[in-house]
Amino acid sequence: MTRLLLFSFSFLFCLTAFAQTNNANYDSTLAKSFGADNYGMKNYVFVILKTGPAVIEKKETRDSLFAGHMKNINRLAGENKLIVAGPFGKNDLKYRGLFILDVKTIEEAKELVNTDPAVAAKIFDVELIPWYGSAALKEYLKTAEKITKHKH
């Protein structure tokens, strides 16, 4: 009998140890507007831009391609498809920058990335990786807009 009682208490303790608690601050309307799941997360595509095989010697051409790259970044951000973008510092991996795209599939991400003139010209190669992150990440752009003094 003592063993049965001890087992029962141990079992109940284990059940409560793994129980989930609800967040008192949860806003279902906000979560739905962000496309959040029950954990406040959603799927994105993480893009790593790497040094590509093309070497563009002509400065005017290179400058034009990078201007197009920046214009494309701004367009995608304006369409709420690009959530985060930025360059990496110098590194041995030949990683040049990253994007986080608010799309559901790798195929959608490929379509968007291929609109970048620097990618099309093979200045950059890309790696596309499914990524699961905070659905609130899109709020980052609103704050970034308020603290950016000079735009590209």
Where would I find each of the regions flagged by the language model?
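Conserved, structured core segments of small domains
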Residues: 20-152
